[in-house]
């Protein structure tokens, strides 16, 4: 089982400790410490109960002890057993186990109850089983980075949810970017949705660190696809593609396949379709995926056409941005009415704006054709007005249906907007005459129950701007996250 890393080394989680009592006779040596083949010895201990002041102390005294035991478990596989030189025998008490676990209750008292004095557990590691027994006898939790996974498995196997919860809490406490993929794999294996969700959140926030960790190439294909499907990864798509190629090379080795272009494509399967190649720049695509040998010649040509020609041909790959943002998408519209016939001659529609709080803009809503279904070419930009610095842009296109609705045009990555800084929203369209907005608002307030007000102020930009102003024109909507 993989370790949680250096930050967790040597740590253990401890629950309730046994209260000190009067000095009494020492407990008999446990058979697990005597070796696997020695005969059991029950040394009489007179009046040991008098030295234990509480029920908890009395049961804790019986933990891993032959005293009054009526069953033994033989554990013969795993690292713990190997280190001990062979099978280990661990004594226990049927009543205590049945009181703490429905699985043990069925084992000892159910319709097919066993009467055997020794029960073999070949799939359980001794250290994990002792951690389970310690918890059942004393409520004490004793887990560490090297045993937490096997203890979680054992707690689930014997239906002890309280110990499961302690294991998950321990894992959550030690969750970091460099072990997030390893823990995500285990969380999915053990059906721990809360831990899996926390792992995914960590991967979202620190994607580059997470995919650079050794554990990334060890994940299974289903976990890889679950991550690639996410809209919230904070990484450039070209770097994500490089990490996926590394995973494919490791998977070829696991399956004992030659590391060839064809085999990498084979092991990736559906995961390849989840890479969002349209989010790359043409330079990133040319330097990486186009030369990787993983894509077919037809796919490479189609993607190059997508990057270079207008109108852009449809491609098989997702072009939705990975927002790396939390919360709900928001949208404001600055116009109160829609009219017909707004023409385009190559001049950009522009409108300046400020906002009262930090937000991230992910796209615009634009008006489409008055002549029925049509495709438009469009370049969208956000420019910091004072510095004349372009913060983000996208050469893309959109299809409209001839209605007066707005149509979403998205940036490849979210653009951070700072409070009280002036920006210019810019859209350069190529296509037929469109609808346009009128009765524009200088101030638009967006309010949600979960967040404070987001207030936009709009100003006309100097110059022609294709006629767009505060009062009327294009760029009716701004799509953003708070």
Swiss-Prot record:
PANTHER family linked = BTB/POZ DOMAIN-CONTAINING, BTB_POZ DOMAIN-CONTAINING PROTEIN 1
Which gene is the coding source of this polypeptide chain? BTBD1
Gene Ontology CC annotations of this record:
cytoplasmic ribonucleoprotein granule; cytosol; nucleoplasm; P-body; protein-containing complex
In this UniProt entry, the residues modified to Omega-N-methylarginine are 79
Subcellular locations according to the entry: Cytoplasm
- State whether keyword Cytoplasm applies: yes
* All residue ranges annotated as the BTB domain in the record: 69-145
Judging by the UniProt lineage, the source's domain of life is Eukaryota
Output the InterPro entries linked to this UniProt entry.
BACK, BTB/POZ_dom, PHR, PHR_sf, SKP1/BTB/POZ_sf
What name does UniProt use for this protein? BTB/POZ domain-containing protein 1
Composition bias, kind Pro residues: at what positions?
22-31
Q: Which GO terms describe its molecular function?
A: cullin family protein binding; identical protein binding
Q: Which UniProt keywords apply?
A: Cytoplasm, Differentiation, Methylation, Myogenesis, Ubl conjugation pathway
Q: Name one GO biological process term.
A: neurogenesis
UniProt entry tagged with the keyword Cytoplasm: yes
- Pathways per UniProt: Protein modification; protein ubiquitination
Any Pfam family the entry gives = PHR
Q: What does this protein do?
A: Probable substrate-specific adapter of an E3 ubiquitin-protein ligase complex which mediates the ubiquitination and subsequent proteasomal degradation of target proteins. Seems to regulate expression levels and/or subnuclear distribution of TOP1, via an unknown mechanism. May play a role in mesenchymal differentiation where it promotes myogenic differentiation and suppresses adipogenesis.
Q: What are the start and end residues of every segment in region (Disordered)?
A: 1-36
The record lists the lineage as: Eukaryota, Metazoa, Chordata, Craniata, Vertebrata
**Domain BACK positions:** 184-284
- Expressing tissues: Ubiquitous; highest levels in testes, heart and skeletal muscle.
Q: How is the subunit organization of this protein annotated in UniProt? A: Interacts (via C-terminus) with TOP1. Interacts with TRIM5 isoform Delta. Interacts with CUL3.
Biased composition, class Low complexity, residue ranges = 1-21
């Amino acid at each position: 089982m993989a370790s949680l890393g250096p930050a967790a080394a040597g740590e253990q989680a401890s629950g309730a400790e046994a209260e000190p009592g009067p000095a009494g006779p020492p407990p008999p040596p446990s058979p697990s410490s005597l070796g696997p083949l020695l005969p059991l010895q029950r040394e009489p201990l007179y009046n040991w109960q008098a030295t234990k002041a509480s029920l908890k102390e009395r049961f804790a005294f019986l933990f891993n002890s032959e005293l009054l035991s009526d069953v033994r478990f033989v554990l013969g596989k795993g690292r713990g057993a190997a280190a001990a030189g062979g099978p280990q025998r661990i004594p226990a008490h049927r009543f205590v186990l049945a009181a703490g676990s429905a699985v043990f209750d069925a084992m000892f008292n159910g319709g097919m109850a066993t009467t055997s004095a020794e029960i073999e557990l070949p799939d359980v590691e001794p250290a994990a089983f002792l951690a389970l027994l310690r918890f059942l006898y004393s409520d004490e939790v004793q887990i560490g980075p090297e045993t937490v996974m096997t203890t979680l498995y054992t707690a689930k196997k014997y239906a002890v949810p309280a110990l499961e919860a302690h294991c998950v809490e321990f894992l959550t406490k030690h969750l970091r970017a460099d072990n997030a993929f390893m823990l995500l794999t285990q969380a999915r294996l053990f059906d721990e949705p809360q831990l899996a969700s926390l792992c995914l959140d960590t991967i979202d926030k620190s994607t580059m660190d997470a995919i650079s960790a050794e554990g990334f190439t060890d994940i299974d294909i289903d976990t890889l696809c679950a991550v690639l499907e996410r809209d919230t990864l904070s990484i450039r798509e070209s770097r994500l593609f490089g990490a996926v190629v590394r995973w494919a090379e490791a998977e070829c080795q696991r399956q004992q396949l030659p590391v060839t272009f064809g085999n990498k494509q084979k092991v990736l399967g559906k995961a390849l379709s989840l890479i969002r190649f349209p989010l790359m720049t043409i330079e990133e695509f040319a330097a990486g995926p186009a030369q990787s040998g993983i894509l077919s010649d037809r796919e490479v040509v189609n993607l190059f056409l997508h990057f270079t020609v207008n109108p852009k041909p449809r491609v098989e790959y997702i072009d939705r941005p990975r927002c790396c943002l939390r919360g709900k998408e928001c949208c404001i519209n600055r116009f109160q009415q829609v009219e017909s016939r707004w023409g385009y001659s190559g001049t950009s529609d522009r409108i300046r704006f400020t906002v009262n709080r930090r937000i991230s803009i992910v796209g615009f809503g634009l008006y489409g054709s008055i002549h029925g279904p049509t495709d438009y070419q469009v370049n969208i930009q956000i420019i910091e007005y004072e510095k004349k610095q372009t913060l983000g842009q996208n050469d893309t296109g959109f299809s409209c249906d001839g209605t007066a609705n707005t149509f979403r045009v998205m940036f490849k990555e979210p653009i951070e907007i700072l409070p009280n800084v002036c920006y210019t929203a810019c859209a350069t369209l190529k296509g037929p005459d469109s609808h346009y907005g009128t009765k524009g608002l200088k101030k638009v307030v967006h309010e949600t129950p979960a967040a404070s007000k987001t207030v936009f102020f709009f100003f006309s930009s100097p110059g022609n701007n294709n006629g767009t102003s505060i009062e009327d024109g294009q760029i009716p909507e701004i799509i953003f996250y708070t």
